[in-house]
Every structure is written in structure tokens, then in C-alpha cells.
Amino acid sequence: MVSAAWLRYPSLLTLGILVSRVAAQYEGDVLRYVDQLVGTANGGHAFPGASLPYGMAKAVADVDGSENYGGFTTEGSNVTGFSHMHDSGTGGKPSMGNFPLVPQICQDDDINKCKFSKEDRAVHYIADSVKARPGYFAIKLNNGIAAEMTVTEHAALYHFDFPHNNAESNGKLPVILVDLTDIQDSRQNAAISLDEDTLRVKANGTFLPSFGIGTYKSFVCVDFSGAEAKDTGIYISNRAGTQPKAISVGRGFNLFYIKAGTYLQFQASSNGPTRVSARVGLSFINEDQACKNAEKEIPGSNWDFEKVRTDAESAWKEKLGLISLKSGGVSDIFQRTFWSAIYRSMISPQDYTGENPLWQSKEPYFDSFYCLLDTYKHQGWLPDCHMSLCKGFTQSGSNADVVIADAYVKSISDNIDWDLAYEAVVKDAEVEPPDWSVEGRGGLMSWKSVGYIPAQDYDYLGTGITTRSISRTVEYSYNDYCVGVLGKGLGKEHEKYFQRSGNWQNLFKADQTSFIDGKDTGFVGFFQPRYYNGTWGYQDPILCSNIAAFCSLTSNSQETYESGIWENQFFVPHDMSTLINLLGGRSKFVARLDYLHDSNILYIGNEPSFLATFLYHYAGRPALSAKRAHTYIPSRFNDTTTGVPGNDDSGAMGSFTVFAMMGLFPNPGQNVYFIMPPFFEAVSIKHPVTGKTATVRNVNFDSKYENVYIQRATLNGKEYTRNWIGHEFFLNGGTLELTLGKEESSWGTGQNDVPPSLGAGIKRDGLRFT
């Protein structure tokens, strides 16, 4: 899954709202529970290096393995360099990793015998040498070179320790390359220069994003200290020279990738290891801005590594101290799982304030999740996904609409122009952009005329990948619901959008069956693709699921996206009551949902599975949601390097873990949190504006998790039977007390206890097919 996931199912946004607006006390050093290596194997793609909360600078060792999307992995790959900006948990292609520093000792101390290409310079690392703590990363390579790094907002600081003698190379002089490349070798053109008097290196380059269109420009300013320089110069391909001190490269003949950069060779210490330090300033504006960032944030010439490191730790302690726990004696496995997940949810979005080259603004600017209304105001459309200043590919719906509705219903109103927000989401719903692969929606002619996105849709208004007709239909339905929510709240047009939000029903084929390995599953009625003329197409309900062929945006693209019809059929977040009735009532709905989970059809490593874990609440069976949460945590979400079951997607998997373990899981775009027992005895959140504290407390809690079913609940001492609660609980504070037992009870099962739905029987007047 790629970084757009936060927009498709944006529980991460809600976590950001809570965490950024609360300030609870913490006991001791919460950083001891953060393991940055969680999710660095098995496709988690988590970034494990040094970063501030939402920081632009992200320093780590880059490796050459196929899973190096976050720079470093724990799967035994080789280190190719150390770079300063990364994303975390994303898919598509590896992102950033621009201008890596490459420490080495060259054969016979001959600069022309240095290893310039990634393939030649790759060196394995000593596994137990890896040390990661918030704001810090350290590693030792098999060639004896050790590296440690820390960061500020826009700069990285490295220590490289070179061994006194390197028998393998028969040399002793430290060399550091500054390479004109990135992780995915996407550089289009670049330039680099070196001042031989100050040893300052400036570089710039144009690169491709990981999952989108266009290019972005990146700039660095590198200073060195700690050892006297012997020689400096440039290299191109596999040759180097002391003159000139600057070089520019393009993509090369026939798009051949030209290897180039600068080198610095230092004198070695006469009596022990040689330390060379490097300060790297970063910018998206220009090289001078990169230098200013470095000089401002890590001033002077004798850089205080420990101060930078402790300042970074303090920033993380402040952020991670926002939520307080009473553990109740649970294993440290669960503490590490919880705090590591919160940590990963705060790596992105990245604060690029002051580093926006797209337009002049003094407003806060975040990338990798973009500032939505600012984007609309300056570029004309809400984005579905954004990274490295570039427009990212839309995966199904126009899910910025969901994010905006989510903020509105949760009363996040400070300095938000809601009229502009409504204008933006209505444009998504009514106007098709020329390129709807990166913004807005495609197929709007059909959406308005027949009430669904047809298979093989004839769409001449814009261009995009005309697949995913089922996924787009169910997501457009929810997008329109969210437009209606905002419209109703603002006293503007909303009924039309509420009506359109029922369009998902137009793809429900009541007699469709499903067979797995030739055996009838026993369930009848599934979504199916439909042509514009109303006739039905066919897609096997298990295709694109966890037990069949994977379907991505560009490879094996089908009528559903990254999940099959079996999973898509449950995505009606706004009208579960209608869906439950359509599937035969509560009992049959629960049986079908059980089958989805128990037959391994659902892939918990992608965001479409998030909501499906907790839909039992709508059928009056909240105990089964709690059971499912404990099924997936810690079996799939845990504190190991493989403890993220799929791409972490900029902390989306982390946010799933945090909300599930807190016992309050949001339905994004609605003022609804599903109530379950927290994985700890108590969880508290304090709101700094209201000064109120919201606490969820378990009674009869046991650390072995035998009592995971709610028997009764009270809110501020009064009986509480609803199995959900609104965001006002966090705004106003209070105590939600849950009495637990070993068996499912009648709590939260009544018709009036389930979360709200838009309602059955939505009139779809004007739609051709019903």
C-alpha cells in the first residue's frame, strides 16, 4: 500500500487531532518502549532512523535490498550510504534518500580505486551494532567504519569513525563521497560544487517522487570537521580527479544513469580511529537556504552532537508523553507495541514550513500529507495523495472529502474557512478534472446519470485508469456522504449528496454467489461490476483478496483495488443498517463478517481491513470487535521487526494499533468512536485548551486478557449502554468505566445502542437503475 492510505481511511488524521491537542503526564522515560526497528522487515517499510516529530530531516543508513523504501531494513541487505530525508512505510517506489554520504577507505589509499557505484561500495553491517532511539541512529559496518547520526528540523549531523588501519584495503585514509543520487536512482539532473578552502559542499538535483507525477528539486549544504583534508575533487563514473571542483550531470545518453559526485580524502589519526563529522543542511528552496538552515540549527564549527541528540529526545518525550497509561501489569510486549505505533504515527506528515517552493506563504506547510485547503486554494483541487512536493496517484475515491468532514464533525474549527472547504469538496463531487489520476474524481458523467461507475466506462472529460469501478463506486458513495455532512452543517446543499451516497446499492447483485476452491461459501448477494447499459459484468468475489491474485493500481488492475469484492462489500461506513438488512439481517451479517476474517480473505496489512475489524458494533455485537482486535494484536501487530503486517503507510498501521489498543476506534468522517476495552488498565488524554481529561478505565482488568468483554459501562458515573461515543468525550473530558468479564454480555446490543446510520430506504430519484 502507498502513502495515500491516510486519505482513503484516515484514522491517522484523527490520531493526529488527538495527539496534537492533548498534554498528559507520563511516568519515567517513555522512549524506552519505542523500538524504531518495528516494521523494518517483511514489507513494513518503516523508517527507523533519526527524526524529530514530523521532522523534515530523517537520517539513516540506506541499504540495497528490495524493501529499502524507508532507507534501512533489518533483512540482511548491504549499506550503500547515509542520507538525510526519507518517507516511512510507503509503497510505490523508494522515496528520497538524496545525496548520500559514503564513508570508505580506498584500496592503497588511491582515490581512483575507491568504490563509486552503489553495487561496488555496498558493505554489510554488524546486526547487533544497530542502535535506534528517537532522534538517534547508529550502526557499524563490516569494514570497521562506525556511524552515528542525529537531527534537527532541517539538518542532520553525522559522526563517522574510521579504523586506524584497514587490512582489507591496505589503506588508512578516510574518504567520504557526496553522491548525486537517491534511493530509487531517479535523478534527472544534478550539480555539485566543493570549496577546497572551507570544505563546504553544495549540491542540487531534480528527482522523481515515489508514487506520483512530476519532479521535485532538492538541495543540500554539507560541512565537514574533525580531520584535516588531504585531497578533494570530483568523480564521474569510476574515475576521479582533484580538478575541477564542480560538476553537472544529466540523465546521460539514452537515459544512461551517470554516477557522479565529490570526494574528500582526510588525513588519518596517528594513534587510533579517525573521526570525521558532517553537518548536512537541507532545503527545497535553494543551496543557500540549505546552508542557512544548517548554520541556524547546528551553529558554530564545533558541533555539539550530544546537545542535538538530547534536544531531539526531549521533543519526542514531549510528544510521546501526551497519552498516559496505567499498564495493569501487561507484558512489555504490549507497551512496546503501543508506544512504537504512536511513534511511527508521528514521523509523517513532514513539516516543510518555510520550505515551500510552490508558492509564497507564511502559513504552516506540511508535505507527504499536504495542507488540503491550501492546495485547493493555490492549485485548484484537493489532493488524494502528496509526496515530495508532487501530486500523488489517486487510488479510488476523492478522500480528502473524508478528512475535511472528519475535522468538521470533530469541531476542529480554528482558522478554517469552511465555506472554502465546502466549495472544494463540491468541486470534487461535480467537476471532473483533466487528469483525475492525481486529483478529484473520474467518471462523473456516469456517476450522475446512472448512479455508479460503470465497468469500461466511456469517459472523455478526463484521463485516468478506468478500472476499480466497484472500489470507486463504494468510495464515491462515502465521499458524497461526507460532502452532505459538511453541507448540512453549513446550511448548504446536502440532500443531493446524501441521496448519491446510496449509489453503492446499484452494484449489489442479489443472486451472486461465491465459491472458493470449488466449494460454495453459502453466501448469496455480492457487488459486481456493471456496464453503462445496466447489464452485469463478472469478477470473482475473491479476486484481489488475500487468498487470490494481488491487484494494484498499475499491475493486474481489476474492478476492486487492493482488496476483493468480499472485503469491499463491507465498506458502507455511513449506512451500515441498510447493508445489514441487504445481507439478511444481523445474524447473517455477523456470519458473513466472521467468514471474511476466519477464511483468511481479509488482508489486515492494508487499510480497507481497518473498519471491517470493528463492524460488529453495527450488528449489536461489540464483543466480537474486541475479540478481533485481540486476534490481530499481537499476532500481526507487535514489537518485532515483522510487527507491521503490510506497508506502514506513513503511520496508518501504527494508528490502527494505537486506536485499537486504546479501546476507541474512529469511523473517519463521522463523530463516532467504537468502544472496546483498552489493552491496558486505563488510558488518559488531557486536552490543553479545555483542561479536561478523558479517561477510559477497565474494571476487572487482567493482564492475560481473559476478561475482554464489556459487561456494563458508565460515563461519569451514569449508566452508558451505547457501544460508541463521540469526539466530545475528548473535548469535554470525563471517565468512561468499563466492567469486564470473560463472556459476551448484552451490553451495547440494543437497537438504540449501535452507531448511527444514514438509514435504509434512501430514495434515489432520477437514477436510472434501482
Swiss-Prot record:
Coiled coil: none annotated. One of its GO terms (cellular component) is nucleus. It is an enzyme of class 3 (hydrolase). Glycans are attached at N78, N204, N533, N638. It holds the Pfam family Glyco_hydro_92N. Keywords: Glycoprotein, Glycosidase, Hydrolase, Secreted, Signal. Residues 746-770 are annotated as: Disordered. It is found in: Secreted. Residues 1-24 form the signal peptide. This is Uncharacterized secreted glycosidase ARB_07629. One of its GO terms (biological process) is glycoprotein catabolic process. Its main location: secreted. Its EC number is 3.2.1.-. One of its GO terms (molecular function) is carbohydrate binding. Belongs to the glycosyl hydrolase 92 family. It comes from Arthroderma benhamiae (strain ATCC MYA-4681 / CBS 112371).
